[in-house]
A protein has these predicted regions:
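Hydrophobic helix-and-loop "lid/oligomerization" segment in the mid-to-C-terminal part
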Residues: 1, 58-225
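N-terminal small/polar loop signature for handling phosphorylated ligands or for N-terminal nucleophile
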Residues: 1-24, 28-31, 177-181, 204, ...
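Alpha-helical scaffold elements adjacent to nucleotide-binding pockets in ATP/GTP-utilizing enzyme cores
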Residues: 2-5, 48-52, 90-93
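Short, low-complexity, polar/charged sequence segments that are solvent-exposed and flexible
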Residues: 7, 31-32, 47-50, 149, ...
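Structural motif
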Residues: 8-11, 26-28, 40, 47, ...
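Glycine-rich loops and low-complexity Gly/Arg-rich segments
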Residues: 10-13, 35-37, 52-55, 101, ...
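Short alpha-helices
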Residues: 24-77
Length: 226
């Protein structure tokens, strides 16, 4: 409503299930809309944005993929969406583009990740690139990751990549701390582990990491964790 009051045109792209009442906008691009007729509904947010870019460029999907395919592939892997259909093609193409990328920011990130000059798989992206990009938002502002991906100065890119590395290391340390405290709680009250749903809480647990910690526990114990 504020954007409308300011006389601006709003276009929304999303990949989540929309509410029954949609926001006021000139266009809402979301494959999960009730009136959507697109054949593939499992794109991540960047995949939807890529579709919009292609549409704004006269429907030239090949050009959009050539320009932004590696970014969309990284996002697709990082968001852990279903790697079938269009997503599978997007990741296959994007990994090839990533191996030859000229994006200064990405090159700095690849070097910091120890992946520069190596062949890429969805696994190397998921465990090497994605955590460092995600760390920007988990420990600080996602703006740092955006600045890195848009950066054209090698020195500045190296500094931004180093900052993401520091945040990722901080994320790892916080994850270990949370898991250790959970282990202590479980040791003090063994009956907790016999519940079908496990609920843990702690002072000062970072909101950007508790979801990761819950996922780790789910992998270890095959139980739902809150």
């Amino acid at each position: 409503e504020l954007i409308a009051d300011l006389g601006m045109t709003l276009v929304i792209t999303d990949h989540h299930q929309p509410l029954e009442t949609l926001p006021k906008a000139a266009a809402i691009v979301d494959a999960h809309r009730a009136d959507d007729t697109s054949p593939f509904h499992d794109l991540c947010g960047a995949g939807v944005a890529l579709k919009l870019v292609a549409a704004l460029d006269g429907g030239d999907t090949a050009m959009a993929l050539e320009q932004f395919g590696e970014l969309a592939a990284i996002a697709t892997i990082a968001d852990v969406v279903n790697l079938s259909g269009e997503n599978r093609y997007l990741v296959q193409l994007g990994l090839r583009l990533l191996a030859n990328t000229e994006r200064v920011g990405l090159l700095a990130l690849l070097e910091k990740s120890g992946l520069l000059g190596k062949s890429f798989t969805s696994t190397s992206v998921a465990f090497g690139i994605a955590p460092r990009i995600n760390a920007a938002g988990r420990f600080g502002s996602p703006k740092t990751a955006v600045e890195l991906l848009l950066c054209e100065d090698p020195d500045e890119a190296a500094e931004l990549a180093e900052e993401l590395e520091r945040r990722n290391q901080a994320r790892k340390a916080e994850e270990v701390r949370i898991l250790e405290e959970i282990a202590e709680q479980a040791a003090e009250n063994p009956r907790l582990l016999k519940e079908r749903v496990l609920v843990f809480a702690g002072e000062g647990w970072h909101h950007g990491v508790i979801g990761i910690a819950a996922s780790r526990l789910e992998e270890q114990l095959s139980l739902i964790h809150i």
